[in-house]
Amino acid sequence: GIMGDILNMYGLFPCKIKAGVFAFCTRGTIRVTINLDEHTARANDFITLLPNTFIQIHEVSEDAEVCFVAFSSRFLESINFIRTISNLIVTIIENPVVPLSGNAAAIYKDFFSLLVRADNAPDSILFTDSLKPVLDLLIQGVVNMYRRFNTWKEPVLSRDKEIAREFVQLVWQYYTKERSAS
């Protein structure tokens, strides 16, 4: 996993992440702005960052540790990632940090530990062909996670935010329609 001191290096400026990132906070806290909304990730929180997300880390506790896996936007396009999660996109954008139950957190901790072991082994089994099933597991986990978690923050939206939300939904609908036609 990535430790707090390395995470602090990303706090100097906001950056755009082109990849899709699935992360799991194993300990500590991280105060971060994701697409202009501030969040705090704590131990046992799962973080989903869609491609082209803007992120800035503000504060990281000394004991913070995050495990993550990132997939290039090209790889995600090749497996129709956006179509798979299309009905959850706005929810994911508005709620990128999800607290997990103890049991689910233990499973994700084991999952990420296994990925690290597989990647660091001299005879690594992680190749492009083997990454699709890994991504499939993560996607299904995220879909189930977002369907089960029903206490999403529903902020009182200003008219500007309401228009922006509707615009994002329309853009994603158009994107998935265009991608399915090709």
Mark where each language-model region is.
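Generic protein-terminus/edge-of-domain signal
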Residues: 1-42
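Short hydrophobic beta-strand segments that form the core of ligand-binding sensory/regulatory domains
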Residues: 21-23, 66-70, 90
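Conserved metal-binding segment of the jelly-roll/cupin
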Residues: 41-54, 70
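Ligand-binding loop in jelly-roll beta-barrel domains
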Residues: 53-74, 80-82
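Double-stranded beta-helix
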Residues: 76-92
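Amphipathic alpha-helical segments enriched in hydrophobic/aromatic residues interleaved with Lys/Arg
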Residues: 90-137, 141, 145, 167
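Short, Lys/Arg-enriched, Trp-marked, Pro/Gly-tolerant hinge/linker segments that flank
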Residues: 100, 123-130, 143-181
